[in-house]
Amino acid sequence: MSFVNSHSSRLNPILFNLLKSLVYFSFSGSVVAAESHYDTLIINARQGDISTATSWFDGQSRNRVLTAAEVTDWLQINGWAGKDAEVRRIWEAYSPTMSLPDPALRAAAKSYRNLRQWQPSVALWSRVLQRSPRDDDARSGLILTLADAGQTKTALELAESRVKREPTANHWRELAWVQRIAGKHTDSLFSIIQAMRYAPQDKALRYDYSDILSSNNVSAPALNALENGKLHGVQTDERQRQRELEAAAELVRLAFIASTTENERFVVADRALARYSALMNQWRTHPSAKASYRHARIDRLGALLVRYRMEEVISEYQSLLKEGDIPSYARRWVASAYLYLQQPEQAEQILSAVIQEDPSQRLQIARQGDFFYSILESEKVEQATQLSVQAGEKTPYKKSVYGLSTFIPNDDWVDIKYLRIQSLISHNDFPAAQRLAERLAFTGPGNQELNIRLAEVYLSRGWPRRAETLLKRVELLEPRSFRLETHQGLTALELQEWRQLEQLTDDTVTRYPDDFSVKRLARLRQVHHMAELRIAGAQGLKSDSPTKGMNDTEIDAVLYSPPFADHWRVFSGGSFNQSDFSDGQATHRTLRGGVEFTDRDHWAEAELSHRNFGLGSDIGGRLSYRHDVNDFWRVGLNAERLMRSTPLQALKNGVTANGAGGYVRWRQSERRSWQADLSHGWFSDGNRRQEYALSGQERVFSSPSLVIDFTPSLSVGANSQQNTPYYNPRKYVAVLPALAIDHLLYRHYQTEWHQEITAGAGRYWQKDASAGAITQLGYGQRVRWNDVLDTGVSVQWDKRPYDGKREQNVSLSFDLNYRF
């Protein structure tokens, strides 16, 4: 053996061990370095450097097969970054061939939930719980995912059972979340309060508390909770603005609730307007707050409506409409504003559009009345009636309230009955309206509003004393009710209780100046205080009767002063009559003046006149008086020197007459009345004239726009002398059954346009002359405007016998009553 060889064989084991050690330490160092780099990637990822880690994993996955731990970290890091689609891709790539730990399953389950893929998310949470039944995070994920998936029943069962076992802050919080999703907002509020009891300093809980308060419409505390729960460095501008809007909207809702005291009824609305003003000033210049600014403008409409700033509501609505759609609740406010401003067509158009978009709102809108009145005041009476009937059929008399074992009376049912009463009145069916109103009032004697509605019906039927008695009786329930005082004021106007009218109107106008019914009362009082002009005239077009002559002209005008000292008015006027008779033309001129007195149950006029006629002139006078015994009976008396009904042909021939008369009227209601008249005239030529008449009115037919009355009349007269220079039948009897038709052509609140038709056919008997038929036909039109103008024009054709010969008379007449 050589040295070399022998030496070499001795060195080989030493070299081998040395080389082995060098290789080991070199490999260990590289492993340690690799592990250190990996840990740094994970730590940096947790601190926000996501892209470096994900890039490394992506590169490594192309070069080699990743380990289960690496896949898990890759899933979790992408989950931290919110890259749910990437998490899903990685999971679906590795899970079929690799057994991954629970953190990987949790990361994938969260991403599936975020991607709204409920079924795989629920399956993954369930797998985690199968492996680790006590994994609380996985149970939370399962509960919340089930709730998001709409499986609220199962989610509630799991959350409730867990909170019973372990009532922690987080468990109560998650139960509140599930209850909120399930629509159990009250329960969710209770649960979040329990959570805060366990962790009162947890600001994140206050965030959830704010959200749940908001979902329960407890807006102001929700805003406070958000303020108290703000986390450092967390941007909450959008959520803050939302809470600010909700708190202001809550004030608007409260503003619509009637306040317990008059002085406070606008306090809440004013607070809402002030709050909106501050918010809008703050958000106006911020582009990010553009949507919130518009939302504030929309909700502000409700506060403006409560404050009766109707023009502003309309103006702001039109401005908002140019910028986009407006939610239905705000459009309903706008409809109310249009209705208040007496623009019912606009209100109906808006509400019809709201109902068309959401038919489920129809019944609710109908119950509130605006839709009904917008249709009714647009003169679509049948449609309004149908609406009230349909709403009544769907509104029960009693309703159930959560938490009560018994049913309670339904206020909506009463409101619908009010609408039904109004529809019956609009149909001119006052008896049915009275029966319904009495049934409501008599079954609720302690309800002042029901009795006020009944009094309103009584007043509409011409029974002010009956209405007064009823209103006085219910005054004890709420003496200062402005609705009560308003109707008492209207009743006082009908009863000529002028001082009472003044006091009630002053009080209601001071307290509720913007209420529509109060403004109506104030308007009627204003009209009462105006001067009044009355003009009436007639022109014969074709006549050959001995009473009218030919080409006859009549005109009479009188001007009344405004009332003074409550009861008094002075008046002055004149008249002109002229006609052609067989013995020449006759002319009669009158100037007159006097005083009028009105008081409760009494009316009187005293007049002095200067009359120029025939062969000279003379001084005349008149006293007229009437007394209302009650709502049904009235008696009247009058006495005249140079009575106005003296035939014009008699005056032409120097024959004058004095007269006296009276009448008794019985008026049951607007549907029936009868009157008996008598008059006696003493002529200067010795003739004595006596006349008696009985006339009546019986309602035959009524509808919203058409009224037909049967108006029979019976006249009897006698004169003591014959062969006078004027028509003077010795005795006569006239019977004339007739119909009077009143057709409403147009109506818009206090503006009305009617056409009137009269037709009659009867018989006339005259002593010492043959009997003959009476035929009568008339057509006219009448306009009433704004409570101050009432004027009409008509054409009449009449044909009847005079001394046995039938003569005709065609004339055109007009009348005007104007207050200014």
What are these regions (language model features)?
Residues 132:
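Extracytoplasmic metal-acquisition and chelation regions
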Residues 1-35, 285:
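Gram-negative bacterial Sec-dependent N-terminal signal peptides
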Residues 40, 69, 73-79, 84, ...:
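Gram-negative and organellar
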Residues 50-86:
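N-terminal, post-signal-peptide region of Sec/Tat-exported proteins
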Residues 35-49:
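Short N-terminal segments immediately surrounding and downstream of signal-peptide cleavage
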